[in-house]
């Protein structure tokens, strides 16, 4: 690798470090932040971290199957549908763990989702409403 490329990556690496929070760089700062959140809220940090990483990982595995099926010739077979079902099971497990970590009732989370989408779309999906949202519509 030429010096110009090495210098570029060194400069970028330094930039990344400068714009990264202390808890993302330092274990002691991370532990302090975890304790701060655990003591100042109902959030259970260990469970939430597990849930967040698990949701990301398992969703990625589900997406990988879909990608291979639609873009790389993987068959839309019963075996692959079952594989996607198993990944959805894992996603649900981590979703339930996230609800527990946040002290949320899973039924209320689902009801809130329905309420949010009904407010956004009414009786029918419209592209305009999905692209241009009202203030406060997350």
Regions found by a protein language model. Name each.
Residues 1-88, 92-138:
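Flexible "arm" and connector segments at domain edges
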């Amino acid at each position: 690798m030429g010096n110009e490329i090495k210098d570029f990556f060194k400069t970028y690496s330094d930039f990344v470090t400068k714009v990264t929070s202390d808890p993302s760089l330092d274990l002691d700062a991370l532990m302090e932040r975890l304790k701060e959140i655990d003591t100042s809220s109902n959030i259970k940090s260990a469970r939430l971290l597990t849930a967040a990483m698990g949701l990301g990982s398992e969703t990625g595995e589900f997406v990988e199957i879909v990608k291979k099926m639609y873009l790389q010739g993987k068959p839309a077979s019963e075996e692959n549908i079952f594989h996607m079902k198993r990944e959805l099971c894992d996603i649900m497990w981590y979703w339930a763990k996230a609800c527990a970590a946040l002290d949320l009732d899973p039924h209320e989370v689902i009801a809130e989702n329905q309420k949010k989408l009904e407010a956004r779309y009414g009786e029918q999906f419209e592209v305009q409403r999905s692209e241009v949202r009202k203030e406060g519509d997350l």
